[in-house]
């Protein structure tokens, strides 16, 4: 059995389908990158037989992923370990060579946004209808100190605009939080609901996909946010994910 074959089986498994929708999307994204990784002689990792996977190959793969960032590489390492552990449980393979590779330590970022940076970003994002949802995601993450992933998937059911409060069960810690909505943010949300209240997401992509409005993906959000940041003349050191620490 090849890695790609195991991946197809895993997507049909109880283990995968019992995950949260957001987690499933993340797994599919990262596992797709893992299986398309070229290591030796342009051969993709997904085309290797499970019996041909070695610790050396795992190490070379991880080193290549680290070229795109240690945190990114560690995400890939986590999902390939999950996949191969599933393979062991199903008796498709006997060992998980990626379990032998020590992850590198991620250096924690200390970059924060200045208030004037936030204002410039929001002014730029809100000046164009196409980027208004990106501005809302950023403003909500900033005001409530919440993860971008949670704000990206926030639904109208989470909001009480009359009482100006938000309810959320955090995706990572599973904690329930109730937070006030400022007058400025509430005004933007009312405007957003007037335009997008017919569907479930607070800050969807501006155009429908296959007949329905979808949230921004984990990949697209930072890319499109970077374009807004460049238009606003902000430093390349800033990341949208830094907002919750600001």
Q: What role is predicted for each listed range?
A:
Residues 108, 117, 144, 153-194:
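Conserved tyrosine-mediated DNA breakage-rejoining catalytic core shared by Y-recombinases
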Residues 182-235:
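Active-site/catalytic core of tyrosine-dependent DNA strand-transfer enzymes
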Residues 8-22, 31-109, 123-125:
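N-terminal core-binding DNA-recognition domain of tyrosine recombinases/integrases
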Residues 133-135, 235-246:
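Short basic/aromatic active-site micro-motif
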Residues 74, 89, 93, 99-148, ...:
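Basic, Lys/Arg- and aromatic-enriched nucleic-acid-binding interface segment
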Residues 71, 89-90, 139, 143, ...:
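C-terminal catalytic core of tyrosine-transesterase DNA break-rejoin enzymes
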Residues 99-100, 163-169, 203, 239-242:
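Short functional hotspots where side chains directly engage DNA or cofactors
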